[in-house]
Structures are given as structure tokens and as C-alpha cells.
């Protein structure tokens, strides 16, 4: 389980609440800092959605990967609209969870969108996830898995 999210509850775009410990166990986790009102976020999110869907698709063995959206939206309604419109079936920290602000500070988020890929202990694998996905597509995931020390036998 990703220590940085230990004890937290996450939500799906449908509103289902899940325990972070269960949902993130033995997975590479990408914290996605973004907002629906942000043009670059709206531009990158469909690409992230395709990347995510390809990795965790049911057609093959799902990859050990999960995205956790950390909203920079102005309201819970804006966050939910953004999630329903463009997001994949990944998870989110609830809008009213003040921990969103702590994560932004911890990972030094000064601009959005930002995709920070982390190890189970919360250490950063890369804070350039967005750039890596744009430049390398699915190929970057294997590097993340190796750096994360989870499921070393994953074959992308």
C-alpha cells in the first residue's frame, strides 16, 4: 500500500468509496494533480485515460497501476464534472479531504497538470510522468515498475 495514502478513502467517478490500502496494494501509483478549468489538464487527461485504459484493460492481465486524482478544481461539483467528462476509471482523493493540500506541498506542485509517479513508500519515481507518457507512451510504464519494486515480472 502506498504509505502516503495510508488510512485514506478514495472515490471513483461514480461516487463509490474505496479504501486506499486495498485499491493501491502492490501497484505503481501516479498522483494526477489537475483541474477541469485548466486547458492543459483538459488536453492531457484524454491521453492519460487512453494510457490507463490500455494498461489495466480486462483483455489482458491488468498492469499493477493506479491513478489517484488530486483535484485543483474550485469546487466539488467542478471536480466531479471533470471526472465524469474526461477521466478514466481511476480513483480520486475526495474534494473535501484537506490532505489534497498536503500532497501538493509534499510533491512541490506549483503548476498543473502534473503526474507524479510514486513508490509504495511515497518516494518519487518521476515527477515528469506527463512528459514521459507524451514522449514514450506505454514504454515508460516498464521503467516505472522496475523503479517501484513491485511485480518485477510484469511484461508490458
UniProtKB/Swiss-Prot annotation:
Superkingdom of source: Eukaryota
Record InterPro entries: RdCVF2 (IPR029519), Thioredoxin-like_fold (IPR012336), Thioredoxin-like_sf (IPR036249)
GO biological process, one term: photoreceptor cell maintenance
CDD domains found in the cross-reference section: TryX_like_family
Thioredoxin domain span: 9-147
Effect of gene knockout: At 10 months of age, mutant animals show signs of photoreceptor dysfunction. The progressive loss of cone function is followed by cone cell death, while in rods, the outer segment length id reduced, but not rod cell death is not observed. At 12 months, mice present a stronger age-dependent impairment of fine odor discrimination than their wild-type counterparts.
Pfam families in alphabetical order: Thioredoxin_8 (PF13905)
Tissue expression profile of the protein: Both isoforms are expressed in retina, in the photoreceptor layer, and throughout the olfactory sensory neuron layer of the nasal epithelium, in neurons. Also expressed at low levels in brain and testis.
Function: May be involved in the maintenance of both the function and the viability of sensory neurons, including photoreceptors and olfactory neurons. In the retina, isoform 1 may be required for rod function and isoform 2 for cone viability and function.
Family, per entry: Belongs to the nucleoredoxin family.
Record's protein name: Nucleoredoxin-like protein 2
Protein species of origin: Mus musculus
Name of the gene this protein is made from: Nxnl2
Amino acid at each position: 500500500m502506498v504509505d502516503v495514502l495510508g488510512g485514506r478513502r478514495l472515490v471513483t467517478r461514480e461516487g463509490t468509496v474505496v479504501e486506499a490500502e486495498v485499491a493501491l496494494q502492490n501497484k505503481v501509483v501516479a498522483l494526477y494533480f489537475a483541474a477541469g478549468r485548466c486547458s492543459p489538464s483538459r488536453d492531457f487527461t484524454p491521453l492519460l485515460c487512453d494510457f490507463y485504459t490500455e494498461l489495466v484493460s480486462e483483455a489482458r492481465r491488468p498492469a499493477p497501476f493506479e491513478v489517484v486524482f488530486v483535484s485543483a478544481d474550485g469546487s466539488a461539483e467542478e471536480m466531479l464534472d471533470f471526472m465524469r467528462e474526461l477521466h478514466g476509471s481511476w480513483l480520486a482523493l475526495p474534494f473535501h479531504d484537506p490532505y489534497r493540500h498536503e500532497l501538493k506541498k509534499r510533491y512541490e506542485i506549483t503548476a498543473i497538470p502534473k503526474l507524479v509517479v510514486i513508490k509504495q513508500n511515497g518516494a518519487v519515481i518521476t515527477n515528469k510522468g506527463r512528459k514521459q507518457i507524451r514522449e514514450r507512451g506505454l514504454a515508460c510504464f516498464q521503467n516505472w515498475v522496475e523503479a517501484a519494486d513491485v511485480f518485477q515480472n510484469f511484461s508490458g
